[in-house]
Amino acid sequence: MSNIIARFHKIQVQDGVKVWYREAGAAGNPTILLLHGFPTSSNMFRNLIPLLAGQFHIIAPDLPGFGFTETPENYKFSFDSLCESIGYLLDTLSIEKFAMYIFDYGSPVGFRLALKFPSRITGIVTQNGNAYEEGLDDRFWGPLKEYWKSYQSDPVFVKSLIPYLEDPANVICQYHDGVPAIESVDPAAYTLDIALIQRTGQTDIQLRLFFDYQNNIKLYPAFQKFLRDSKIPVLVAWGANDTIFSVAGAEAYRKDVDNLKVVYYDTGHFALETHVVAIAEEIISMFAEN
């Protein structure tokens, strides 16, 4: 019973990052790496972890720049760097084979890991984790696509994006948009996100990652080739009402994955807030060892 309760750790890895992570389940079970997105942390998996820990060994880190992970002063915030830090964590923990649960920013981090360690990936759960241009909903990405045509410190774009990043309402709406009954969403989740993202230096970190996101799109063909070549099983568990990564991004996985299951939920971006039990059941059904 004790194995299903998350244990908390902080460990310094090769690049100087002190990675804070949650761990649960027996180390002898198949490992699933849970990779969160913006603007949250591994806290988004708080309800999923005990549902999976009986069948899996769970590792859920806070990405650099998020949650309680600490970075050195000279850390360069890019998706390449985030991938490198998580790769160091996996090596430090001697984790050789693992499946991934990817969400939002966790998707480009996870797919970079797959390109770096293709033989180590045993499967993917993508919950609103995009790898296709058609999945980029312009209601969210339109302004950022214009920003990418300029330069990172362009004052016009920076001036418009800072209020977006610093307004708590823009965190809350990611939890509420597309959810039929918003009272079903735990307010503690976005309240923690808001508190963490309002810390000193956070706005600059998130601006850098916003600008760098364009480099993820350039890697989409490589991500897709990995899916075709690896033949790994993929579960697409998608909040169908997401206004950041659309259903078109979920459907696009059909082009490159043979061993695929696609499941839609009547909810928004943070599908675990409303459908955690259903998603856990799909993961166990597809990936647990009998």
Swiss-Prot record:
Catalytic residue list: 269
GO molecular function: carboxylic ester hydrolase activity; epoxide hydrolase activity
Keyword Hydrolase appears in the UniProt entry: yes
Keyword Hydrolase: yes
Entry-linked InterPro entries: AB_hydrolase_1, AB_hydrolase_fold, Haloalkane_dehalogenase
EC numbers: 3.1.-.-
Signal peptide: none
Entry protein name: Uncharacterized hydrolase YNR064C
Species: Saccharomyces cerevisiae (strain ATCC 204508 / S288c) (Baker's yeast)
